[in-house]
């Protein structure tokens, strides 16, 4: 990570933490490195089953929505490799590539983040969600999100 990416990640987390977005807490930053508070979770990609995959998906999308609507921040690299889960709760990690919603490609990046997560849940847990409806939800154009187990 370079110095600018570390600053960008630190800034994003500083904006999102007070909004109750599930992000790791920064303990310290020195030039290009961030030290985060320890999280006892595993990458979502490592799970072959979840106790309640629909709830986990809803929680991820709720965090994406809050990040976008209240924080004005888009992760821009969201996938199953950037979500930690401890069996009870999630954390969205890896924010050095985050962009503000005023970025010219912000909607494309937001849609890509949503599609990456929906694709993973469909493939791994057979959970279906309408991509258009999920997009409307995270953009604040709908208050409901329909998720169906296949």
Summary of predicted features, one role per range:
Residues 32, 36-53, 97-100:
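A glycine-centered beta->alpha junction motif in the catalytic cores
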Residues 3-10, 57, 111-114:
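Amphipathic alpha-helical transducer elements in NTP-driven molecular machines
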Residues 52-63:
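Conserved alphaE helix
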Residues 1-42:
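Conserved ATP-binding subdomain of kinase catalytic cores across diverse folds
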Residues 19, 62-73:
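Protein kinase catalytic-loop region centered on the HRD/HxD motif
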Residues 69-72, 86-150:
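C-lobe/activation-segment region of protein kinase-like
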Residues 78-85:
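Hydrophobic residue at the +6 position relative to the catalytic HRD Asp in the kinase catalytic loop
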Residues 1, 48-49, 106:
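Flexible beta-alpha connector loops of hexameric P-loop NTPases
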């Amino acid at each position: 990570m370079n110095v600018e990416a570390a600053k960008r990640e630190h800034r994003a987390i500083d904006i999102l933490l007070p909004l109750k977005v599930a992000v790791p807490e920064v303990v310290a930053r020195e030039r290009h490195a961030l030290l985060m508070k320890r999280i006892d979770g595993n990458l979502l990609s490592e799970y072959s089953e979840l106790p309640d995959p629909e709830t986990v998906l809803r929680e991820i999308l709720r965090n994406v929505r809050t990040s976008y609507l209240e924080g004005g921040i888009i992760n821009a690299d969201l996938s199953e490799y950037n979500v930690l889960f401890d069996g009870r709760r999630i954390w969205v990690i890896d924010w050095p590539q985050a962009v503000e919603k005023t970025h010219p490609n912000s909607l494309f990046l937001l849609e890509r983040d949503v599609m990456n997560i929906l694709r993973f849940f469909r493939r791994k847990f057979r959970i279906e969600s309408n991509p258009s409806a999920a997009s409307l939800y995270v953009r604040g154009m709908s208050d409901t999100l329909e998720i169906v187990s296949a």
